[in-house]
Regions:
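Short beta-strand->loop
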Residues: 30-33, 114-115, 130-132, 137, ...
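Conserved C-terminal helix/tail region of periplasmic/extracytoplasmic solute-binding proteins
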Residues: 312-341
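Mature extracytoplasmic/periplasmic domains
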Residues: 254-313
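Early extracytoplasmic/lumenal segment of secretory-pathway proteins
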Residues: 25-87
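Short helix-loop capping/hinge motifs at secondary-structure junctions, enriched
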Residues: 133-140, 173-181, 262-268
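Ligand-binding pocket segment of bilobal, Venus flytrap-like solute-binding proteins
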Residues: 163, 170, 175-242
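A structural signal for short loop-to-beta-strand junctions that line the ligand-binding cleft
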Residues: 73-78, 96-128, 143, 153-156
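Periplasmic solute-binding protein
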Residues: 83-94, 113-140, 168-169, 251-257
Length: 341
């Protein structure tokens, strides 16, 4: 899939070059979010405000790219899929605070940085997909993924992916490093195959009988359900809203940082504020099946039918702080090598 993303990146760079030369009212957005998920929302922003959004997409490495571009970087905002990516951008020194009364009013304190360095625009739950036919448990915890009764029955995408390092970061916060290592070793021992693909592949593999359970983001259930070629995968699974034994459901988010050298700061702030408006939050929920970050905006009905996530007592800041340790743990236990023979 990676090779197919080069064209949007090059096209985005060309848009930036032409837009900057023209001096039009615009904002330059670097993003790790798939264009198909975010572009319809950005098009609505442009239609309502007249501000053009120049989009540059890459699967990873955009914070480092902005750093290398220095004060010549055209990027005004970085929109990413994981809190740790945003805190990494802050650590690289490429951001400035994004604090306004509108953002503070709309977004709860738990979903924005205390120092104003980042702000969430949507939230997602890391849930368990389970076979309807082969798994009868009404509830499961994340710890259950390491239970020997699931040996040879677990599927996940690679542990190095941000969605899984986020979950592992939360596990470290809940269990401590030693118990988290034992847990991840247990999950590896239960793998049905070498981690590969994405979250949709977890549902696909369960439907094919390759595995019985796996972890994936909730919103993919909604996306697959409206895809005629993938709906059968959804029909084969139950969605279980898991918790940690002494905590809640792991929630991560997609969010924004304002770049240090933003040339279109006013437009960037305008976009950030618009993304947390009720209208934009409703679009996020309806189009992307994510959880709104703004109180009072309804969860998409299909997703709401799977139940409400239990609030976790581990903050996103704690998840971000454990990111390096989580990545090292994935490597240490050899998770992405797959099940041991």
């Amino acid at each position: 899939m990676t090779h197919s993303l080069r064209l949007p990146l090059l096209a985005g760079a060309a848009l930036l070059a032409s837009g900057l030369a023209a001096g039009a009212q615009e904002v330059n957005l670097y993003t790790h979010r798939e264009p198909g998920l975010i572009k319809p929302i950005l098009d609505r922003f442009t239609a309502e405000t007249g501000v053009k959004v120049n989009l540059v997409f890459a699967g990873s490495g955009l914070a480092e790219r902005i750093q290398s571009e220095g004060d010549r970087s055209p990027a005004d905002l970085l929109l990413s899929v994981d809190v740790s990516t945003l805190t990494q951008a802050v650590a690289l020194g490429i951001t400035q605070p994004i604090v306004t009364p509108a953002l503070e009013k709309a977004v709860p304190k738990t979903l924005r940085a205390a120092d104003g360095s980042w702000v969430a625009v949507s939230a997602r739950a890391r849930v368990i997909y389970a076979s309807k036919d082969r798994v009868k448990d009404p509830a499961l915890t994340y710890e259950d993924l390491a239970n020997p009764r699931f040996k040879g029955k677990v599927c996940t995408r690679p542990g190095t992916h941000a969605y899984n390092t986020g979950l592992i970061s939360a596990a470290i916060a809940h269990m401590g490093p030693e118990k988290a290592e034992a847990w991840l070793k247990g999950v590896r021992a239960n793998l049905a195959k070498k981690p590969s693909g994405g979250d949709r592949d977890v549902a696909k593999d369960i439907a094919a009988g390759i595995c019985d359970v796996g972890v994936a983001n909730m919103y993919y259930v909604g996306l697959m359900n409206k895809d005629a070629n993938q709906k059968a995968w959804v029909d084969a699974i139950r969605v279980i809203m898991p918790t940690f034994q002494n905590g809640g459901t792991h929630m991560n988010m997609s969010g924004l940082v304002l770049t240090k050298h933003a040339r279109n700061k006013a437009e960037a702030v305008r976009l950030a504020e618009w993304l947390v408006s009720p209208a934009a939050q409703e679009l996020y929920a309806a189009n992307n099946f994510e959880y709104p970050v703004v109180e009072g905006v309804a969860v998409e009905p299909f997703i709401a039918g799977f139940g409400k996530p239990k609030a976790d007592n581990v903050s996103l800041d704690d998840v971000a702080k454990n990111r390096k340790a989580a990545s090292e743990l994935v490597e240490k236990v050899g998770y992405d090598l797959g099940p041991q023979s």
